[in-house]
Amino acid sequence: MAFRDSTRDFNRSRPEKRHASRSSSPRSFRPSNQNARANYNLPRVRDAMKEEERSRETKEMQEREFLRLQQLRRAIIRLKNDRSKPIDKLLVSVYLMPGPEWEENGEKNSIDFGTVDMFDPLSVIQSYKAEDLEEISRNIGDIQQLETNQCRLTYWKYVKMLVNSRMEHNKVGQFSRGLKVVAGEVQRILAPKSFEQLEQLEAQIQKKLKSNVPLDTDYWVDLLNSLKSYKAIAYLKKTFNEELQIRKNKLDNEEWDKAFSDAKKLSNMKDREEKLYIVPIDPKPILRAQAIPRRIQPEEQADYEKELNDHVNIVKSSTYIPISIPTQKQKPTLPKNSNLINEDEFSIANRARLEREYLQSDDAEEQEMLGDYVEGQTRVVNENGVTLKKPHYFNRVLLGFEWNSYNQAHFNEAHPPPKAVQGYRFNVFYPDLIGTGRAPTYRIERTRRKNKSDTTDLQDDVCIIRFIAGEPYQDIAFSIVDKDWDYSAKRDHGFKSSFDNGVLSLHFRFKKLHHRR
């Protein structure tokens, strides 16, 4: 039997290893298809990232513009409604400046300023107290973050500079140690200078402080700080005085025209006999002491006069003061019968008298009737388009415990039920009806028929009581509990219906339901 040489077969089966010669050149690297595609798409990715960045910046800019215009719109609304914040006048005034340098992309076309006019920024800042100045300084920081217009940014820079200067003045006094002696001289030198002259002087002082020349550093530093305040004042005068003077001249011409027109009307008017009201003098003012809020503190005469003089000086130094114009066009109203006392004074005098009566009666169950006036239930204009007057009123609601079957079952005298309405006292004022022989009336209006047999319902029905006087007054309506009235003439708490000296009085209580206990 023949055997093969296994070693030879093994060696023959092994693959022959080939070694590359050292002298042979290495292979050249060829990138894969994936790397080639990545290198090819890299410019596209960069362009997409740049486009995304531009889109993000555009959105942020649009958002800032939206928030900035919303700030302006809210300020205009508050000014129209006479509830403005300290920053509002400064904000609206800068947007009313004419010229393309103060406007971007026609933004003023989207803003309705209405009757809001420009204010003198210097007068506005001088009229505010320390706490108002602090609020203005905080608000300016928020505005500067949203602002993009360079002219308005410069404006806010100097407004904030002046506000901070006044705040510092209120804290440590107008001048520090170095300037107390020469305060008048500093004001005499800096006040007349223009904005450009103050800029030159500021540069000279800064150069002097940086030099090695011996000098009184405290004096020059304090002078530099004072110069910033005068520089801000000079900038605001330079920026606004021309436009404010134009508006002032226009207002002067309008007032002259109106004065001539009024004088012509007065010359054509005939003398008319005026009817005067007889208002009794308050005999016992001390009885109103309980109605005066305790938080009201007396003011010293000297402090009051100083504050008044400060306001007078601010008005005198103002270039232009806008006139407060109503936001809505005033409709014609009927003439009053008297020029001696108006509706408000008549109402105040009679409210004081009624308050004294209620204090003397010591009825703890009475409260002022609030929130029961029914809107939209009356005609406010007559056939000729003349606005009717809404009468003033002073109403009281009478409260007390009601021991019906439900309350007897769930409450006792130690733990009483909630107080329920037991009656009303209506006092409506009609001063123009004095001496006319006319008296107002009232009527009850129900939306559904009253069910007299239902005495167990826990929810009281309501109805409307309407007071009618005719022209020049509107009807006036109130929502009241619909229960049967007690017409008995009891002293103090009985039924009363009268019209005396221009006051309609309607006092009544509800009938009581008696239950055995």
From Swiss-Prot:
InterPro entries associated with the record: Cactin_C (IPR019134), Cactin_central (IPR018816)
Disordered: annotated span: 1-59
Composition bias, Basic and acidic residues: 1-14, 44-59
One BP term from GO: mRNA cis splicing, via spliceosome
Composition bias, Low complexity: 22-32
Pfam families assigned: Cactin_mid, CactinC_cactus
Cellular component annotations (GO), alphabetically ordered: catalytic step 2 spliceosome; cytoplasm; spliceosomal complex
Entry coiled-coil feature ranges: none
Mutant phenotype after disruption: Leads to abnormal splicing of introns featuring long spacing between the branchpoint and 3'-splice site. Sensitive to cold and thermal stress; simultaneous knockout of tls1 exacerbates the growth defect at both higher and lower temperature.
The protein's assembly and partners: Interacts with sde2. Interacts with cdc5.
Family statement drawn from the similarity comment of this UniProt entry: Belongs to the CACTIN family.
Role, per record: Plays a role in pre-mRNA splicing by facilitating excision of introns featuring long spacing between the branchpoint and 3'-splice site (ss). Recruited to the spliceosome by sde2, which may enable folding of the RNA between the BP and 3'-ss to guide the splice site towards the spliceosome's catalytic center. Assists the splicing of several components involved in chromatin organization.
UniProt-recorded name of the protein: Splicing factor cactin
Organism: Schizosaccharomyces pombe (strain 972 / ATCC 24843) (Fission yeast)
Name of the coding gene: cay1
